[in-house]
Each structure stands twice: as structure tokens, then as C-alpha cells.
UniProtKB/Swiss-Prot annotation:
<protein>
    <recommendedName>
        <fullName>Putative alpha-1,3-mannosyltransferase MNN14</fullName>
        <ecNumber>2.4.1.-</ecNumber>
    </recommendedName>
</protein>
<keyword id="KW-0808">Transferase</keyword>
<feature type="topological domain" description="Lumenal">
    <location>
        <begin position="35"/>
        <end position="685"/>
    </location>
</feature>
<keyword id="KW-0812">Transmembrane</keyword>
<keyword id="KW-0472">Membrane</keyword>
<comment type="similarity">
    <text>Belongs to the MNN1/MNT family.</text>
</comment>
<feature type="glycosylation site" description="N-linked (GlcNAc...) asparagine">
    <location>
        <position position="338"/>
    </location>
</feature>
<dbReference type="GO" id="GO:0035268">
    <property type="term" value="P:protein mannosylation"/>
</dbReference>
<keyword id="KW-0325">Glycoprotein</keyword>
<keyword id="KW-0735">Signal-anchor</keyword>
<comment type="pathway">
    <text>Protein modification; protein glycosylation.</text>
</comment>
<keyword id="KW-0333">Golgi apparatus</keyword>
<dbReference type="GO" id="GO:0000033">
    <property type="term" value="F:alpha-1,3-mannosyltransferase activity"/>
</dbReference>
<dbReference type="GO" id="GO:0005794">
    <property type="term" value="C:Golgi apparatus"/>
</dbReference>
<feature type="transmembrane region" description="Helical">
    <location>
        <begin position="14"/>
        <end position="34"/>
    </location>
</feature>
<dbReference type="InterPro" id="IPR029044">
    <property type="entry name" value="Nucleotide-diphossugar_trans"/>
</dbReference>
<dbReference type="GO" id="GO:0000139">
    <property type="term" value="C:Golgi membrane"/>
</dbReference>
């Protein structure tokens, strides 16, 4: 019987029933889609299926093996949300085969809980090394604190219960804080990959890897993915004002800014990078060093433009005028310098400017200069060669990032420092889904991880290709914000290379040699003064100095640069001359305090250099030879003097022997002339 033959009243009821069924189906569809949009239901997107064989997991683990030192970390909580109630193999296969980068980004950020997306730069993390002690150490130290000066104090069972509760609470908070930091850094890195770096070459390789694999899943083309960017730059970088710094050319007096569309500030900055140049950051306190460096650059016939980064309250009008005069006033007919002052204050929201005090200014200098290739120089650094030559160093040309090592001293980090740094590294999922590479043995071979050495990098001079490593200062900034990270490094030094490893960018190089001592070799007579029965000679040689210096690993001879100015002691305002003169362990050739004072204030004389051994200490030797590669001569130059040794112990092992370099008369004369230029007086009003 056809529909037309049904009585009118019955037909009416039937149409109503049909309408209700259709309405229910439509409603269910929209409810499902709404849930999918919030990341709650991904069943049809990343469906569980028994048709994905175990061989696929083997294929993934072969091509993306978990790196053992970081494999024990849980990874981002977002991945747990994403794969919840899903078969991991089916989900990953679906993503690799069907999702482009934009869809992967949306999938990730839809699974981030809103309250876990951002950690405010002012987030009050508690960091106390006491909380990282093991139970026995924590208990004993807690009892000691309770005891105080009361020798008769005995801890009760109630005291011990309280101590145990505090211990457990501290460990729980540490685990929670580290997971929060890990997840936040994951969000930052993935955002940068999605919307700034946009490297998609890894996806093409994945398609080639699974080409021909057509395992069936119930995947439906990403209907919940809108094509609209879910997370904005303003959300991810709340400390950026989205406004341009002010670039003031001293030669013309012209101030310029760049225009950026809303939420594309960083892309605009990146796209405007061009050329090579020198970058510095100073405040009024550094103006003397900076003027002397400008004089030195003029003598070296520098032609690279210079950008000096500062914040509004740090550099006075008088200092700006002095910089201008130092760059253009007649100076032995030497070339003028092209200097631009960069006021970065407008680019940072006022409430976050304090996060970039002191060492943090260097991060702003790396981020806001406009050079594609930059050489960052501390105001008190001394260049021996024309800056252009640094860009020709092989390791820089091969990687676009060249760093220099610090003194190889025997100072070490606790295990929990190492564990925290490793916690920030990329996971296997980061590499599979976003092409963010896991670290390799290259990172683990760096002395911080390999030997737990505290000081790896000396950051007075840094070479960086900004376009190749654009995200680096963004990660550095976030490292600098948070106390559990900031308190584990000294200033900015280790952040330069750690930030790159955290991104998964191991395309950076270190000059092979650790920092050297430069000056004059200590005489035999000076060294034997402290021995009751001195040896007839020493295997090792010694230089005591206040200036970390850097020798090229291309010829194991050329002095490239050193830090701490050209004055023999760069801490004169802190020196107690009578006290330092009274110590006779070194510098005993000066028989009056006036001679001692004159030497302290004079230009450094460079005749030789010692690169100490790679090993920091040795138990071998006959008691006369040094057991450490560097000895801290704390009584001198307000604690800044270190003595370097060419060998330690018996010097029988290769890593117990360093390198002694004796410079030619021509080289010594060049160093002398540089010292004269740097030490020369000036009067810029």
C-alpha cells in the first residue's frame, strides 16, 4: 500500500515521526561534532582497529627510536589526552597518512586543557635545593634545623612524621612543577613549528615511509578541523606587546619601526631579518667598556653595522651621545662605525620587563636585532681579528651557530639538575607527529651531561644565523622566566646551547678548546715559593690570569678573542690593594704596593697561552705537579684570578695534557697595539 493511500490523519502522524527521527539524527551529529571540536571524541578520527598490525609499531620504533636518556619521561599530558581510549598504532598511522601539519597542530591544541596552555612568566614556582635531597639527607637536615642551638634536642616520632609529610609534599610538588614546565615547553615548541618555522619536509618523508601501506581504519576526513588557527601568538607569548622596538640610527638620527599584523609579530620580525652585523646590549654602567670596544673595532677596520640593544631606563641621553661621538669622532683617521640604538621597551609588556633584567637583556638582544647573521659581543670582550673573519670559521659556516667553551674547572652539578634539563627535551611523539627531533649522543656528549660539569659555555661572543635558529631566543626567554630552570644555570651561558637542544636543533657547534689563560708564563722561582723541598723542575707550565681566552681549533694557535677587557685586573673597584699585596703566593716580583698597584691597572701583556687538559683533575703525580687543570687564586683581583696548567698529575694520559702556545714577536706586538688602543683615554662630553 502506497503512502498516498494512508488516511490524512495517519499520514500527519507519520510525517511527524519522520521529522522527529531526522531531527534526532541531526542533533546527534551536531552533538558529536561539538564534542569532537573540544577534543573529547576522536573515535572516527583516530579510531581503534585491529587491522593495524604489530609490524607498524616496529616500523615506527625503528625509524623513530626512543632516545634512552629521555625515554623514561612521561611526555606531554596532551598526548595522553589525544590517545586516550585509542589504539596508539591506529592513531599514529592515521595521523601520518592523512594529516598535514596544520591538521596535526589543530589536533594537538584541541587536546590541551585551557588552564594548562600557558604558564605565566610570573608563575610562582618554588625552588629550594633542600627539597631535592634524598630521604636520609632530608630527615637529618630537618632535624638539624629543628635542633638549632639546642644541643639537648631529640626529635620525637611526631617530629619525624611531620618531616616525612613535608618530604612527600615537596617531592609531589617537584614532580607536578616539572610536568607543568615540560608540557608548557612542548606547547611553545609545537606552536613555533606550526606557525613560525613551518618545516613540513618530515611529512613528505613519512609519506614515503608508509607508501603502499593501506591498512583499513574507520578514519573520516578531519571534519572537526576548521582550518582556523586555534592558538594565537598573543596567547603563547603573553609578554610580547606585538609592537615594534624603536631602531634609532645614530648617523642620521632617524628612528624606524616595522609594522606587524595582529598575531604575526614574530613572523614579521623573522621575515625582516637580513645581512650581517654586530649585536651588543649595554646600560649606563657598561658605557666605558662599550666605548673602548668601539675604538677597538675602528682599529680592526670593522665595516659591519652595529646594533646596541637597551631598555628605556638603562641608557641615558648622555650615554647615547658618547656612543655617537665614539663612533664618528676622528680617531687616528680610522673608519667610523654605523651604530643603531634599539630600544626594546615598546616590544615588551611593562609588567614583564623585570623578567629581562641583567643577563636577560642578552636574550632581548638576540631576539630583536634585525640581522640574519649576527655576532653578539659582550661590552668587555676583546676581538683580536676583524669581526668578518668570525663568519668564515668552518664550524659556523657548517651550522649557523658557533659557541665557545668556558674554563674547564672541576665544579659539578647534582643529578637533579641533569634530570630537569632532560625533562625539557623532545619526546618520541614530538618527533613522530611534529618532526621535532629527539636529542642524540651529541647533546649527551657535552660536558654538562657527560661529566656533570657546571660551566660549559662562555657567552661573551656568540655567532648565530637567526633565520636558521629563529626559535632559539624564544626558548631562552622562557627558560629565564622560571626559577627551577634559571637557578640551575649561571646567567645566560648554558641557555644558548641548551635552548637549541630543547628544540631538537642540534645543528650547533662548539669551538673544541676550552677557555685558555693568556699572559706570561709563571717563572720557576715564583712557583717553588710554596714548596718546602721544591723539585728541580716542573713538567707543567702555568699562567695566572683574569681573562678567559679562546684559541681557534682550526690551527690550535690563533687567539680569537678574550673577555674581561684589556686591563690586567678588571675588578679594580673591588680590590683591596693592601690585602692582595700581602699575599705572596704569586706576583712577588713587585716589592712595593705602588708597583703592585701599577701592574694591576696596566694593560695585559700577552706572550703565551695555556689551554689546560680536558680532564679537570688527576690523582696522579708526585705532589709537586698540579692535580687540577685550573686553580682559583682567590686572594687576587677580587677573586677573579685563575691559574691554568698545561698538564696535571704525571701527564701520562692524553686528556691530562693541554697545550702551550708561545706567540711570535709580530703577534705580541699586535696584542700590545690592541691594548694601547683599548686603554687610551677619551673625553666625550
Amino acid at each position: 500500500m502506497g503512502l498516498l493511500s494512508i488516511p490524512y490523519q495517519s499520514k500527519s502522524k507519520l510525517w511527524i515521526a519522520i521529522f522527529l527521527v531526522v531531527w534526532s539524527l541531526i542533533s546527534m551529529h551536531f552533538i558529536w561534532q561539538s564534542q569532537a571540536n573540544s577534543g573529547l571524541i576522536l573515535k572516527n578520527e583516530l579510531s581503534s582497529t585491529s587491522s593495524i598490525p604489530h609490524e607498524f609499531e616496529m616500523l615506527i620504533d625503528t625509524n623513530y627510536p626512543k632516545f634512552k636518556p629521555t625515554s623514561g619521561h612521561s611526555g606531554s599530558q596532551t598526548y595522553s589526552n589525544l590517545f586516550k581510549n585509542q589504539d596508539r598504532n591506529a592513531a599514529i598511522f592515521t595521523i601520518l597518512k592523512n594529516f598535514d601539519l596544520e591538521q596535526r597542530c589543530q589536533l594537538y591544541f584541541k587536546n590541551v586543557k585551557n588552564d594548562k596552555l600557558i604558564v605565566d612568566p610570573d608563575h610562582d614556582f618554588k625552588f629550594d635545593r633542600f627539597d631535592y635531597l634524598n630521604w636520609d639527607e632530608y630527615r637529618d637536615e630537618s632535624i638539624k634545623r629543628l635542633k638549632g642551638d639546642n644541643d639537648e634536642f631529640v626529635a620525637t616520632s611526631s617530629d619525624l612524621d611531620t618531616i616525612k609529610k613535608n618530604f612527600d609534599k615537596a617531592k609531589s610538588r617537584i614532580a607536578s612543577d616539572l610536568q607543568l614546565l615540560h608540557d608548557y615547553f612542548s606547547h611553545i615548541k609545537i606552536y613555533n613549528q606550526c606557525y613560525i618555522d613551518r618545516n613540513t619536509s618530515f611529512i613528505k618523508k613519512q609519506h614515503e615511509l608508509i607508501d603502499g601501506l593501506n591498512w583499513k581504519t574507520s578514519f573520516k576526513r578531519s571534519s572537526f578541523l576548521s582550518g582556523k588557527q586555534i592558538v594565537t601568538e598573543q596567547q603563547m607569548y603573553p609578554w610580547l606587546s606585538q609592537k615594534s622596538p624603536e631602531y634609532n640610527c645614530l648617523a642620521t638620527g632617524q628612528t624606524t619601526k616595522f609594522a606587524a599584523n595582529k598575531n604575526s609579530f614574530l613572523n614579521t620580525l623573522k621575515n625582516n631579518l637580513n645581512g650581517k652585523g654586530i649585536v651588543m646590549t649595554i646600560a649606563d654602567a657598561h658605557i666605558d667598556y662599550c666605548i673602548r670596544l668601539i675604538h677597538l673595532l675602528r682599529y680592526l677596520k670593522n665595516t659591519l653595522p652595529i646594533q646596541i640593544i637597551y631598555t628605556s631606563n638603562d641608557l641615558s641621553a648622555e650615554s647615547k651621545s658618547q656612543l655617537h661621538q665614539a663612533s664618528v669622532s676622528d680617531f687616528d683617521g680610522l673608519p667610523q662605525q654605523n651604530i643603531t640604538l634599539v630600544n626594546v621597551t615598546p616590544a615588551i609588556k611593562p609588567q614583564y620587563l623585570h623578567k629581562f633584567n641583567e643577563f636577560g637583556n642578552k636574550i632581548l638582544a638576540i631576539l630583536f636585532n634585525t640581522f640574519e647573521e649576527m655576532i653578539f659581543i659582550d661590552a668587555d670582550a676583546i676581538l683580536i681579528e676583524n669581526p668578518e673573519k668570525f663568519f668564515q670559521l668552518t664550524k659556523y659556516k657548517n651550522s649557523g651557530a658557533l659557541f665557545f667553551r668556558d674554563r674547564n674547572t672541576s665544579e659539578y652539578r647534582p643529578d637533579h639538575d641533569i634530570e630537569m634539563f632532560l625533562k625539557l627535551m623532545n619526546s618520541q611523539y614530538d618527533e613522530i607527529i611534529f618532526g621535532l627531533l629527539q636529542i642524540t649522543e651529541k647533546t649527551m656528549s657535552i660536558p654538562l651531561f657527560d661529566r656533570k660539569i657546571s660551566h660549559v659555555m662562555e657567552s661573551g661572543l656568540v655567532l648565530l644565523n637567526r633565520k636558521v635558529h629563529f626559535s632559539q631566543p624564544l626558548i631562552m626567554a622562557n627558560m629565564n622566566f622560571f626559577e627551577p630552570i634559571r637557578e640551575r644555570v649561571y646567567g645566560d651561558k648554558e641557555m644558548f646551547w641548551l635552548s637549541l637542544s630543547i628544540i631538537g636543533d642540534e645543528n650547533y657547534q662548539f669551538n673544541s678548546h676550552p677557555a685558555a689563560a693568556i699572559g706570561q708564563l709563571t717563572t720557576y722561582q715564583e712557583r717553588v715559593k710554596t714548596f718546602e723541598n721544591p723539585p728541580s723542575s716542573f713538567k707543567s707550565q702555568e699562567i695566572c690570569a683574569n681573562h678567559p681566552a679562546h684559541i681557534s681549533d682550526e690551527d690550535n694557535h690563533t687567539l680569537l678573542w678574550f673577555n674581561s677587557g684589556f686591563q690586567f685586573c678588571n675588578q679594580l673597584e673591588k680590590v683591596n690593594y693592601e690585602d692582595e699585596f700581602s699575599h705572596k703566593e704569586r706576583y712577588s716580583q713587585f716589592d712595593t704596593i705602588d708597583k703592585f698597584k701599577t701592574f694591576w691597572q696596566s694593560s695585559l701583556v700577552i706572550e703565551s697561552a695555556i689551554i689546560p687538559p680536558e680532564n679537570t683533575n688527576s690523582n696522579g703525580g708526585d705532589g709537586y705537579e698540579p692535580s687540577v687543570s685550573w686553580k682559583h687564586m682567590e686572594p687576587y683581583c677580587a677573586g677573579y684570578t685563575w691559574c691554568a696548567y698545561s698538564s696535571i698529575g704525571n701527564g701520562d694520559q692524553a686528556n691530562d695534557r693541554g697545550l702551550v702556545i708561545n706567540y711570535s714577536p709580530e703577534e705580541i706586538e699586535h696584542f700590545k697595539k690592541l691594548g694601547e688602543i683599548w686603554m687610551r683615554g677619551y673625553n666625550y662630553l
